[in-house]
Amino acid sequence: MANFVLPPIHDNSDGSWGPSTSTLPAQFKDIPYAPFSKSDKITRIADWHDPQAEAAAGTRTARTVQSGGRRTAYGAAEGTVFGFVHDEDEKSFSLVDSGVRVGARGKAPIRGRSVRGVASARGARGRGGQRGGFSTRGGRGGARGGYGDWNKPQRTRDSSVTIGPEWEVLEEIDFNRLSKLSLSVEDPEDLASYGTVQAYDKTFDRINTRNEKPLEIVNRVRYNPSTSDDPIISQYAEKKEAQIFATDSILAVLMCAGRSVNSWDIIIEHRNGQVFFDKRESGPLDYITVNENAADPPVDSDDVSNINSAGSLSLEATYISHNFSSQVSANSKSKAYTPNPNPFYSPEVESEPPASTLYKYRKFDLSIDEEEQFSVILRTEADAYLGKKEVLVTVKALNEYDPRVQGGSGKPLDWRKNLDTQKGAILASEMKNNSAKFARWAIQSILAGVEQMKMGYISRANPRDAQRHTIVGVQSFKPLDFARQMNVSLANGWGIVRTIADLVLKQPEGKFVLVKDPNNPLVRLYKVPDDTFEAGAEEEEEEQDEE
């Protein structure tokens, strides 16, 4: 039987770690230390079986084949640890990984063209944001911008209002909480109607791409005063007719808050046990957004001549909507319907006639139980009547500013060429890019109790000219069906209104501001001083008096 003799153990005389270099065996001299891998099994003397390497043998990538299956430990590979380059200066040498990195052959370079046609990496669209996920067109390595913009910096938007240092945050509600609110409301009570409304010209329904009609500039005055500036609402408030007072445009923004991307603000006043929802003059609620929910929405620009900036497009959309709603009823030969005079129009002051608008004041019951008395009075609007005076319609306008860049992540469709044959695809694209705007229009029409929504497709006569436009089509919708198609929940909107009103009523009387965060899906309720926003209004009044 063979005997096993233990080799001698040489202790280090100076007490340091490891054997002394003087006692190192001759066969191990001049061999540098090689690092080992963390996955090495050091509990056995020898183990030639590596199940991980065998499992990965059939699924090796080009990079593992190139490196010979070498495992990396502590940032260095075992097979390449000696692959250093001998330099003239021995003191400056270092161990480097000499493995050649295999690039993705055939991958298209990311250039400026990725801005158009390739969706930006925005959080709302997920990684890449491109329709269909990671596109691998062109075979191997042909990723055409699918995730090339993953590290693209996200856009930082500005708040619609400057948050003052004296503003106190009372509540912060994210959209996830808002989406869970619900309150069923019965049919409203019609209180009164004011203004003059004219008949809708049915010839506009026959407009198509082969029978276009230019958009005319109609000199009509359209009023949209805030809640507190409405004399009719002031009368109802004095009589304690309701607990909440607002307009349909203000309440629609609040009820569709979960779809908002841009920042907005609503002024809320609590006085005499009542809540008033107001808007700032010339604030974001007075203008129509364009492609707010698109993957690559328009951006603000300091260049005043840029007609495709977010601000310029919003102003253009508001201008188009005003003229289109006036044009469809301006040449009507039917008799105008005036239940009561327009409360905002004064012939002594205005030289132009008022636009066709019927202001309907309606009362909605927001009570939770039978014993509670909690209601809201709204001022709603209708733009024309259809055939009979009782059949009211609202008129809205969609604007096409540049078909080459307006198509979003999909293929752009020129309205003048494709509206008649692909109206469904164009409408679906507009619903996707303008989800917040469409939802607000649907809510406003439902609150007003109109029978139809008339939506006009307005295109620029020349993509480089924002002054001349052409009507290329008109489409009709029933508000309730349109809301279902947009997945708009009226019960959820009423739940949001009741929740915000309850939060304000729990606070002492004063002024509050509800602000949608510009970069996060949430709203904040601020307690602000009573003189907030009044200094600017007084300055504007002084300037008007001087003029």
Swiss-Prot record:
Designated name of the protein: Eukaryotic translation initiation factor 3 subunit D
GO biological process per UniProt: cap-dependent translational initiation; formation of cytoplasmic translation initiation complex; translational initiation
Primary site of residence: cytoplasm
Organism name: Cryptococcus neoformans var. neoformans serotype D (strain JEC21 / ATCC MYA-565) (Filobasidiella neoformans)
PANTHER family documented for this protein: EUKARYOTIC TRANSLATION INITIATION FACTOR 3 SUBUNIT 7 (PTHR12399), EUKARYOTIC TRANSLATION INITIATION FACTOR 3 SUBUNIT D (PTHR12399:SF0)
Recorded domain comment: The RNA gate region regulates mRNA cap recognition to prevent promiscuous mRNA-binding before assembly of eif3d into the full eukaryotic translation initiation factor 3 (eIF-3) complex.
Compositionally biased intervals (Gly residues): 126-148
Record GO cellular component, one term: eukaryotic 48S preinitiation complex
Region described as RNA gate: spans on this chain: 284-298
Keyword rRNA processing applies: no
The family this protein is said to belong to: Belongs to the eIF-3 subunit D family.
